[in-house]
Amino acid sequence: MKVLNSLRTAKERHPDCQIVKRKGRLYVICKSNPRFKAVQGRKKKR
Protein backbone atom coordinates (compact mmCIF):
# COMPACT_ATOMS: atom_id res chain seq x y z
CA MET A 1 0.00 0.00 0.00
CA LYS A 2 1.35 3.39 -1.00
CA VAL A 3 1.19 6.40 1.31
CA LEU A 4 0.42 9.53 -0.71
CA ASN A 5 -0.24 13.20 0.00
CA SER A 6 -3.00 13.41 -2.58
CA LEU A 7 -5.23 10.63 -3.89
CA ARG A 8 -6.25 12.44 -7.06
CA THR A 9 -3.88 10.50 -9.34
CA ALA A 10 -4.28 7.27 -7.36
CA LYS A 11 -8.02 7.03 -8.06
CA GLU A 12 -7.42 7.43 -11.81
CA ARG A 13 -4.90 4.59 -12.13
CA HIS A 14 -7.52 1.95 -12.88
CA PRO A 15 -11.24 2.13 -13.73
CA ASP A 16 -12.12 -0.09 -10.74
CA CYS A 17 -10.34 2.10 -8.16
CA GLN A 18 -12.61 3.78 -5.64
CA ILE A 19 -12.12 6.09 -2.67
CA VAL A 20 -13.32 4.88 0.73
CA LYS A 21 -13.27 6.72 4.05
CA ARG A 22 -12.50 4.47 7.03
CA LYS A 23 -11.76 5.68 10.57
CA GLY A 24 -11.21 9.23 9.34
CA ARG A 25 -8.64 8.27 6.70
CA LEU A 26 -9.05 8.21 2.94
CA TYR A 27 -8.15 4.97 1.17
CA VAL A 28 -8.07 3.98 -2.48
CA ILE A 29 -9.07 0.35 -2.95
CA CYS A 30 -9.02 -1.69 -6.14
CA LYS A 31 -10.48 -5.19 -5.95
CA SER A 32 -9.46 -6.25 -9.45
CA ASN A 33 -5.84 -5.12 -9.06
CA PRO A 34 -4.83 -4.83 -5.36
CA ARG A 35 -1.43 -3.30 -6.09
CA PHE A 36 -3.16 0.05 -6.66
CA LYS A 37 -4.12 0.37 -2.98
CA ALA A 38 -3.19 3.68 -1.35
CA VAL A 39 -3.79 5.68 1.82
CA GLN A 40 -3.64 9.43 2.28
CA GLY A 41 -0.93 10.85 4.54
CA ARG A 42 -0.44 8.48 7.45
CA LYS A 43 1.86 9.31 10.34
CA LYS A 44 5.17 7.42 10.17
CA LYS A 45 6.09 5.03 12.97
CA ARG A 46 9.41 5.61 14.69
From Swiss-Prot:
SUPFAM superfamilies from the UniProt entry? Ribosomal protein L36 (SSF57840)
* Name of the encoding gene: ykgO
Q: Which Pfam families match?
A: Ribosomal_L36
InterPro entries for the chain? Ribosomal_bL36, Ribosomal_bL36_sp, Ribosomal_L36_bact
Which residues, by range, are in coiled-coil regions?
Answer: none
**Which cysteines are cross-linked by disulfides?**
none
Q: Which NCBIfam families does this entry report, sorted A to Z?
A: PRK00831.1, rpmJ_bact
Gene Ontology cellular component terms for the protein in this record: cytosolic ribosome; ribonucleoprotein complex
Identify this protein by name.
Large ribosomal subunit protein bL36B
Query: Keywords of this protein's UniProt record, alphabetized?
Result: Ribonucleoprotein, Ribosomal protein, Stress response
Q: Which HAMAP family match?
A: Ribosomal_bL36
Which family is it part of? Belongs to the bacterial ribosomal protein bL36 family.
Q: Which PANTHER family match?
A: 50S RIBOSOMAL PROTEIN L36 2, LARGE RIBOSOMAL SUBUNIT PROTEIN BL36B
Does this UniProt record's set of keywords contain Endoplasmic reticulum?
Answer: no
